């Protein structure tokens, strides 16, 4: 766990933070493998006359994408569990007036294609369950005070051959300057020996030597939603063992004014709001065009196809879409791209690509946030769609709808038969405030 060693030493001299050494194992609830994680961010939530959110900060991390057991790396670790993969990191928690009733740490995992997950951890689980402090003796404290970057042998001992060679070691040229090779100087039957200084055996050890032999306590904790597991590591030699952490209790009146689930509640309220606005926008667009819409996607349908069913499919597709709306939705990803591009960010889509939510009305399921490519057929000016792991255009599937949103917030709600309701979604100041708070896009 060199990552924990490095940051434990770094934050010790930086001061003002508590190093929370954690490992994120491969979990069935995560959307992808741990080696697919592109970046990690964290923020803290503290009580300061209300819920106070710190800014998002980027974390450096190490990925172990193989089977690993803590005892194979740390011989005195108290865990025998085998993990199929780990993400190793250290979260620097600022030292403030802690209120363990509601204080928390939010860990954001960013995957390819704007897929992300947030893990909310209680500060109490990260700090207060640590083992009791065992102050090292004065001798051991002196031994580990050296720079851990200095490399030494494990036992600091020399073999007899090495000690013998040291006796004949001398600085200077290999041969005296006046020696002519091939001639034997008279009177010099034996080579002149210059004994080197007496070899002094090193007895001091270094933090890098003792770090992997110390006692380590590993404990699994669950996040706020009881969904994800995180392993917290407490090291015997970590400087945090000597830190005095105080908990400030909240009064009954203060507890009534705060909500420990504020992070999720604000997100769910916004999802309900934007989902309702998208559906309202689709209905108003249909009314503006006098309930007429054109075929935009290449799709064959039977002669006895009933156009009266389209409005029923539209209502059914809207219900399925908003029922389980998540932050992986195409409208969320499109807004992230739109605001990020305005702030000088890069484009996540090619010119012929959009974000899409694919709605299967026959199963009542939705695939959110797919990257969709539009292919124009010049013979009929109709589009076909293509995506990974899909053999044919989504519009060719029976009883299926789709919502497509471009990076310019151009919106298409596609009904069976390839008919589309087209418009452009407009942002409000509330949208910008939410995305700045939730994703740090300011």
UniProtKB/Swiss-Prot annotation:
Pfam families in the cross-refs: Herpes_UL17
Subcellular location as annotated: Virion; Host nucleus
Gene Ontology BP terms: chromosome organization
Record key words, sorted: Capsid protein, Host nucleus, Late protein, Viral genome packaging, Viral release from host cell, Virion
Top-level taxon: Viruses
A GO cellular component annotation in the UniProt record: host cell nucleus
Family per record: Belongs to the herpesviridae CVC1 protein family.
Oligomeric and partner information: Interacts (via C-terminus) with capsid vertex component 2/CVC2.
HAMAP family reported in the protein's UniProt record: HSV_CVC1 (MF_04017)
Function: Capsid vertex-specific component that plays a role during viral DNA encapsidation, assuring correct genome cleavage and presumably stabilizing capsids that contain full-length viral genomes.
Protein name: Capsid vertex component 1
Organism: Human herpesvirus 6A (strain Uganda-1102) (HHV-6 variant A)
């Amino acid at each position: 766990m060199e990552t924990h060693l490095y940051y434990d030493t770094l934050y010790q001299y930086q001061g003002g933070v508590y190093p929370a050494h954690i490992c994120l194992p491969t979990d069935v609830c995560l959307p992808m493998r741990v080696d697919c994680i592109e970046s990690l961010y964290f923020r803290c939530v503290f009580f300061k006359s209300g819920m106070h959110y710190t800014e998002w900060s980027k974390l450096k991390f190490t990925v172990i994408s193989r089977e690993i057991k803590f005892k194979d790396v740390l011989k005195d670790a108290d865990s025998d569990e085998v993990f199929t993969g780990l993400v190793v990191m250290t979260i620097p928690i600022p030292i403030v007036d802690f209120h363990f009733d509601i204080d928390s740490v939010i860990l954001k995992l960013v995957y390819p294609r704007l897929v992300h997950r947030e893990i909310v951890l209680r500060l109490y689980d990260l700090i207060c369950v640590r083992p009791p402090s065992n102050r090292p003796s004065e001798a051991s404290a002196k031994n580990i005070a050296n720079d851990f970057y200095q490399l030494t042998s494990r036992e600091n001992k020399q073999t007899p051959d090495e000690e013998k060679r040291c006796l004949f070691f001398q600085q200077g040229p290999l041969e005296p300057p006046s020696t002519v090779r091939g001639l034997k100087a008279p009177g010099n039957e034996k080579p002149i020996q210059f004994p080197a200084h007496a070899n002094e055996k090193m007895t001091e050890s270094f933090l890098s030597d003792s770090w992997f032999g110390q006692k380590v306590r590993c404990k699994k904790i669950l996040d706020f939603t009881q969904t994800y597991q995180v392993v917290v590591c407490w090291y015997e030699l970590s400087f945090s063992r000597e830190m005095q952490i105080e908990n400030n209790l909240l009064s009954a009146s203060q507890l009534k004014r705060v909500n420990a689930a504020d992070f999720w509640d604000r997100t769910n309220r916004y999802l309900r709001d934007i989902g309702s606005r998208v559906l309202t926008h689709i209905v108003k667009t249909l009314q503006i065009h006098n309930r007429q819409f054109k075929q935009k996607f290449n799709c064959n349908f039977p002669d006895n196809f009933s156009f009266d069913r389209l409005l029923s499919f539209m209502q059914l597709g809207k219900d399925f879409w908003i029922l389980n709306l998540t932050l992986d939705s195409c409208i969320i990803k499109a807004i992230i791209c739109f605001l990020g591009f305005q702030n000088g960010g890069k484009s996540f889509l090619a010119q012929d690509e959009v974000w899409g939510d694919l709605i299967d009305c026959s199963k009542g399921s939705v695939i959110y946030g797919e990257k969709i490519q539009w292919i124009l057929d010049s013979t009929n000016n109709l589009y076909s769609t293509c995506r990974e792991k899909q053999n044919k255009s989504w519009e060719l599937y029976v009883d299926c709808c789709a919502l497509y949103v471009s990076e310019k917030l151009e919106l298409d709600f596609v009904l069976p038969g390839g008919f589309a309701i087209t418009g452009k979604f407009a942002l409000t100041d509330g949208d910008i405030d939410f995305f700045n708070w939730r994703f740090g896009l300011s």
